């Protein structure tokens, strides 16, 4: 990579439509878990969240934090250990079970009667509830309003054609004075079809700008050796804070 391509000042790719017809099915996501193709999972948690977590929480306790497409994110334990309640949604039952096993947490499971085949897994301590279903089937009316969202790997995984529906779902879950931390990726989408999908700043404005103040907290070079196989030569990760207008 030449020096200009490693710069954090690389302009975002102007064509936001290039990936609009890309689709991954729920079955394909489940297969990724079964086949161990989960390089997106961060065993040590997300370092940008770790860096900004105390600023994000502002010393509060008892908050309700939502993890869309949660997988087995270790960050759920971070919030629970700080006295917050975690609600997650994940299509892979395997991912949910691995979370509880790897975090040494006992849990219960029960069916969600209004959603055929869906289940909810709850930690025995009661402060982590993970719903195994599609994000669009998530029983929103049952859980009440949430204070925070940590979206790392959700918006960038949702099929581009479903983003507006996804954003509206997220916003419908939030109560007053909400905060949302959102991570997205910037790269040349003509070279890699996704996922993770390319989400430029303009798309975040389109999806959330009417309801939210949007502030980019940090931008980092996220390019690793494995990303060369994607055909790209740079990858930036951006952390946004969305707050109620």
Curated annotation (Swiss-Prot):
Catalysis performed (reactions): S-adenosyl-L-methionine + a thiopurine = S-adenosyl-L-homocysteine + a thiopurine S-methylether
Modified residues (N6-acetyllysine): 58
EC numbers: 2.1.1.67
A biological process from GO: methylation
GO cellular component, one term: cytoplasm
Major subcellular site: cytoplasm
Keywords noted in UniProt: Acetylation, Cytoplasm, Methyltransferase, Phosphoprotein, S-adenosyl-L-methionine, Transferase
Superkingdom field: Eukaryota
Assembly information from the UniProt record: Monomer.
Family in the record: Belongs to the class I-like SAM-binding methyltransferase superfamily. TPMT family.
Protein name as it appears in the record: Thiopurine S-methyltransferase
Organism: Chlorocebus aethiops
């Amino acid at each position: 990579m030449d020096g200009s391509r490693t710069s954090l000042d690389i302009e975002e790719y102007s064509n936001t439509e290039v990936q609009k017809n890309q689709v991954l099915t729920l079955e394909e996501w489940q297969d990724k878990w079964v086949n161990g193709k989960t390089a997106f999972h961060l065993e040590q948690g997300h370092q940008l969240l770790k860096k900004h977590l105390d600023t994000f929480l502002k010393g509060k306790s008892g908050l309700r934090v939502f993890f869309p497409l949660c997988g087995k994110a270790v960050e759920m334990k971070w919030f629970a250990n700080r006295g917050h309640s975690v609600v997650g949604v994940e299509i892979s039952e395997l991912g949910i079970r691995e979370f509880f096993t790897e975090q040494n947490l006992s849990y219960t499971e029960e069916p969600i009667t209004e959603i055929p085949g869906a289940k909810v897994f709850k930690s025995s301590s009661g402060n982590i509830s993970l719903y195994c279903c599609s994000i669009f089937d998530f029983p929103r009316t049952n859980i009440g309003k949430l204070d925070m969202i940590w979206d790392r790997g959700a918006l960038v995984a949702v099929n581009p054609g479903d983003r507006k529906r996804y954003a509206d779902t997220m916003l419908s879950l939030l109560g007053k004075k909400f905060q949302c931390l959102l991570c997205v990726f910037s790269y040349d989408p003509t070279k890699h079809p996704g996922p993770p999908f390319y989400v430029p700043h303009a798309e975040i404005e389109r999806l959330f700008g009417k309801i939210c103040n949007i502030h980019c907290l940090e931008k980092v070079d996220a390019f690793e050796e494995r990303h060369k196989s994607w055909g790209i030569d740079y990858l930036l990760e951006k952390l946004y804070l969305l707050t109620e207008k």
